[in-house]
């Protein structure tokens, strides 16, 4: 809310240079500028406005600025499907790369499995690594990438599904897995 008091013989005012969604009204000698900017911008934009008084033989004016920052943006820039991978527990993850832009100055990620990390270089957040071994059932890791900036955060979600490696347990007697045999002699129980 921006307010100005009309002085002397001024009875009204006009305001120019406001961004879309911002308006003004004059009531009881007060000029009020208010609203929500509805603009499609990708970088910070400065709107210089001018308020000019009316109703007096000599009009006065003043200026001000409204600076509008864009909302955050984020996009998956690695191959389609990299944000929904299924892999074995000791296989490396294909890199998942997100690019943040507009109002975003950084990004964070949560929900990654052990062994998988993220790093930021420039405006790119890369998720990579090899899930740690030791699971016995399929594990689904939903993760969230959230931008950091001055305005509304952008959020994207993905999943990493980790399958356990097939395992074997020796069920015959101990030592039967390392036998020394002679020709024509069967494997011992």
Annotate each language-model stretch with its function.
Residues 1-5, 91-99, 186-189:
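A short beta-strand segment in extracellular, disulfide-stabilized domains
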Residues 12-31, 107-125, 169-170, 180:
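Low-complexity "stalk/linker" and mucin-like segments enriched in Ser/Thr/Pro/Ala/Gly
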Residues 31-43, 126-137:
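Extracellular/luminal low-complexity segments enriched in Ser/Thr/Pro
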Residues 43-55, 137-149:
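A short beta-strand micro-motif common to beta-rich folds, especially ectodomain repeats
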Residues 58-70, 151-163:
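C-terminal edge beta-strand
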Residues 71-81, 165-175:
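Proline-enriched interdomain boundary motifs that mark the N-terminal boundary
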Residues 84-92, 178-186:
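Short, solvent-exposed loop/linker segments at the N-terminal edge
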């Amino acid at each position: 809310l921006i307010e100005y008091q009309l002085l002397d013989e001024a009875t009204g005012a006009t305001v120019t240079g406001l961004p879309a969604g911002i308006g003004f009204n004059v009531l009881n000698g007060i000029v009020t500028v208010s609203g929500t900017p509805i603009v499609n911008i990708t970088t910070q934009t400065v709107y210089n406005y001018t308020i000019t008084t009316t109703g007096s033989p000599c009009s006065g004016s003043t200026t001000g600025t409204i600076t509008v920052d864009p909302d955050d943006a984020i996009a998956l820039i690695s191959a389609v499907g990299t944000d929904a991978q299924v892999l074995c527990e000791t296989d490396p993850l294909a890199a998942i790369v997100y690019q943040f832009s507009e109002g975003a100055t950084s990004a964070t990620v949560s929900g990654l499995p052990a062994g998988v990390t993220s790093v930021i270089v420039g405006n790119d957040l890369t998720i990579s690594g090899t899930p740690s071994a030791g699971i016995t059932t399929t594990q689904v890791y939903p993760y969230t990438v959230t931008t950091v900036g001055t305005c509304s955060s952008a959020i994207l979600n993905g999943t990493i599904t980790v399958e356990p490696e097939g395992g074997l347990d020796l069920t015959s007697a101990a030592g039967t897995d390392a036998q020394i045999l002679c020709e024509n002699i069967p494997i011992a129980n």
